[in-house]
Amino acid sequence: MVTKAFVLLAIFAEASAKSCAPNKADVILVFCYPKTIITKIPECPYGWEVHQLALGGLCYNGVHEGGYYQFVIPDLSPKNKSYCGTQSEYKPPIYHFYSHIVSNDTTVIVKNQPVNYSFSCTYHSTYLVNQAAFDQRVATVHVKNGSMGTFESQLSLNFYTNAKFSIKKEAPFVLEASEIGSDLFAGVEAKGLSIRFKVVLNSCWATPSADFMYPLQWQLINKGCPTDETVLVHENGRDHRATFQFNAFRFQNIPKLSKVWLHCETFICDSEKLSCPVTCDKRKRLLRDQTGGVLVVELSLRSRGFSSLYSFSDVLHHLIMMLGICAVL
């Protein structure tokens, strides 16, 4: 009887250790907000439970969130840049924040391959009333595990002086009230990936709030195509950069608001497996098999006149870029 008890106990322990089905998708979602960084990875990566994964190798603060394990760095203020092992670097006027999520099991043996999800957020700093305000320009993700190798990609949002998109326009910049209706030129660019991957601009919409789900919205681009004649998409799905232009504007009849936020959802498409170029006379596009990582990039541009989401399935990234142009009229 005692022997049977030990056998049952061993079987129970083994079953408990395999309570989650190993997920072998190399996917990471990174939300880089001005004051907070949120990172998500698919639950049970390579068989690891959430309590076995540590943010910065120090904090076991992951929680289940809609099929993912979520880790939060809640404070990027100068007094707390090292939260849970977060590393920071300041090279004026740029702030870099680095962290990682690693597997860490204290049992006698380990049967799951180790994982290491490293990520960073890069911010362009400005100073208002002696407090640092971050305007993000770049987000970088680096994934490493025991058998699948590594990948690293860098995404950036840039403004340009004209439709040639050859000369970048450094932010922040000032626009006068008389410039409402003038053209603004923007591009979403991916770096660190091979030429087989193309940037595909899916949708862009504007809100009078930094919240991309704000109920009052003005659609600019839908399914890769302009919604009216004031928006022009130059390159979409043909290169490592998607470029477009739109007329500067502001929302009416909204008291005490001087900001308009432009939100753009962008995909990185594997051109060897999918047809990436977007043709606007054929609105139906293949956007299946998207599982994954979201990088949120928020950029605030100050002006005086008005203002203005990457999955990895066989390497398919999904990015949400948020661009805000502050306006004072």
Curated annotation (Swiss-Prot):
Q: Which domain of life is it from?
A: Eukaryota
Q: List the disulfide bonds.
A: 204-264
Where is the protein localized? Cell membrane; Secreted, Extracellular space, Extracellular matrix
Gene3D superfamilies xref list: Zona pellucida, ZP-C domain (2.60.40.4100)
* Positions of the ZP domain: 19-283
Instruction: Give the main location.
Output: membrane
**Could you tell me the keywords of this UniProt record?**
Cell membrane, Disulfide bond, Extracellular matrix, Glycoprotein, GPI-anchor, Lipoprotein, Membrane, Secreted, Signal
Molecular function GO terms recorded: extracellular matrix structural constituent
Q: Subunit arrangement?
A: May form homomeric filament after self-association or heteromeric filament after association with alpha-tectorin. Interacts with CEACAM16.
UniProt domain comment = Zona pellucida domain may enable to form filaments.
The protein's job, in short, is: One of the major non-collagenous components of the tectorial membrane. The tectorial membrane is an extracellular matrix of the inner ear that covers the neuroepithelium of the cochlea and contacts the stereocilia bundles of specialized sensory hair cells. Sound induces movement of these hair cells relative to the tectorial membrane, deflects the stereocilia and leads to fluctuations in hair-cell membrane potential, transducing sound into electrical signals.
Annotated protein name in UniProt: Beta-tectorin
